[in-house]
Amino acid sequence: MTPVRSAPSGRTGTYHVPVLLSEIETMLANATTVLDCTLGGGGHTAAFLERGVRVTGVDRDPRALAAARERLGEYERSGQFRAVLANYAALEEAGFSTDDRFDGILLDLGVSSHQFDDASRGFTFREGAPLDMRMGTDADLDAGELLNTIDEVDLSALLRAYADEPRAARMAREIVRRRERRPFATADDLVDAIRAVLGPRSGAPDFARIFQAVRIAVNDELSGLERALPALRDRLTPGGVLAIISYHSGEDRLVKNAFRDWSASCVCPPRQFVCTCRGRPLGDTITRKPVSATEQEIDQNTRARSARLRAWRSA
């Protein structure tokens, strides 16, 4: 969901052009109806709307949704665009019918540039920024509350799984030790704990990795994605395309494995002894390898460096 640069006027106004926009447009070129599950600033959706595509945009962030509706108000008034406040992992709770089908479905995971640039949202390690990191009002705890209450063993597992941190146990122990003296309240508190473990030479890449891990836990991102994948697959029309941009190895692994399983000749559960799917794959994987941002795009915005795009087509 990470944008790259300001767009020329007439394309998307003063907003940023989303990562891998041309690749997404190519993969969903035949779509006449699109579900944008991570509306954010509305960059992808704006491009689809300009082509005459009907778009339903979903976001769990009320502020992001309000801004997108203001930006795309003309399309909403005409009926071409519909905005829905919802978590893409729980569309039924937002009133989506099981009969709602789309030619294209897009997920641009991670934090939007608008969320990232707003220091009050607490997604960055800016000095004095609050430890919040909630993408929407549906998160149970903010980052500070999580760090102040989570069990040391669970925190160690979180840092190991989501940040690939080899010193996860030591870092968890340091966080627990510090919170006993004073609760974590700002980004500085977490940065100081990271430095205490990784040393004075630790810097922005280390902070970003740990902050990302905490954010993933706060918003239940990997579990939500895992639950959503089969449900979104079933919302595709025949020949419809599911395109997903990820920024974390755990996200990409979930997407890759799901697409592989859905493209197999037999999709019955492993423990089912008799095949009932008749040996027909559910569809085919469009991207054998993930598509990355070009060097030019990365030069314009380093946030695009970790973007990985995979796409799958329904039979």
From Swiss-Prot:
InterPro entries: RsmH (IPR002903), SAM-dep_MeTrfase_MraW_recog (IPR023397), SAM-dependent_MTases_sf (IPR029063). GO terms for cellular component: cytoplasm. The keyword Transferase applies. GO terms for biological process: rRNA base methylation. Pfam families: Methyltransf_5. It is found in: Cytoplasm. Its EC number is 2.1.1.199. One of its GO terms (molecular function) is rRNA (cytosine-N4-)-methyltransferase activity. The keyword Methyltransferase applies. S-adenosyl-L-methionine binds at G42, G43, H44, D59, F96, D108, Q115. It comes from the Bacteria. Its main location: cytoplasm. It catalyses: cytidine(1402) in 16S rRNA + S-adenosyl-L-methionine = N(4)-methylcytidine(1402) in 16S rRNA + S-adenosyl-L-homocysteine + H(+). Keywords: Cytoplasm, Methyltransferase, rRNA processing, S-adenosyl-L-methionine, Transferase. NCBIfam families: 16S rRNA (cytosine(1402)-N(4))-methyltransferase RsmH. Belongs to the methyltransferase superfamily. RsmH family. Specifically methylates the N4 position of cytidine in position 1402 (C1402) of 16S rRNA. This is Ribosomal RNA small subunit methyltransferase H. It comes from Gemmatimonas aurantiaca (strain DSM 14586 / JCM 11422 / NBRC 100505 / T-27). The gene is rsmH.
